Amino acid sequence: MTHEKPLDVAWSTAWIRGAAAAVAEHRDELTALDAAIGDGDHGTNLDRGMHAAVAKLDSQLDSRQGAGGVFDLPAGVLKATATTLLATVGGAAGPLLGTAFLRASRIGDLPVLSSQDVAMLLNEAAAGVQVRGRAEIGDKTMLDA
C-alpha cells in the first residue's frame, strides 16, 4: 500500500493533533480508569499536556514562516512535543511520554519518513518508556497496552 500524503512535518503535526483530540475525547474515561487505581488525574494531566503540545507546535510553525529549521523536520515536531509533555504532564505519565517522544525524535534529519522510519521511531519510543519506567512486557504497564 502506498501513502497518498508524505510522512513529513504536516503528517507528524497532524499525528500530534489527532492524539490530542483522542485524549480530549476520552479525558473523563482516562481519569475514571486512573481513579480506580490511582489519584484520578491522568486524563486531565494528559489532556493539558497534549493541548500545550499542539499550542507549542502552532506557535513555532506560525513564527517560522518558511524560515526553515527544526520545524521543517518530523524530528523537530516530536522533540517539541517531548519537551512540552515533560514540562506540563504531571505524575509518572509526563516523564514516560516525554521520554517516548524524545527517543522517537532521534529519527534524525529526515524531511520525509518512510513507513520503516515510522516503525523505527515507534520502537524507539517504546524502548524509551521501557528504560525510563524500568518496565518489561507483562508488568501491566503502558507497554502492555
Q: Residue spans of the language-model regions?
A:
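N-terminal loops that bind phosphate or other acidic moieties
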Residues: 1-145
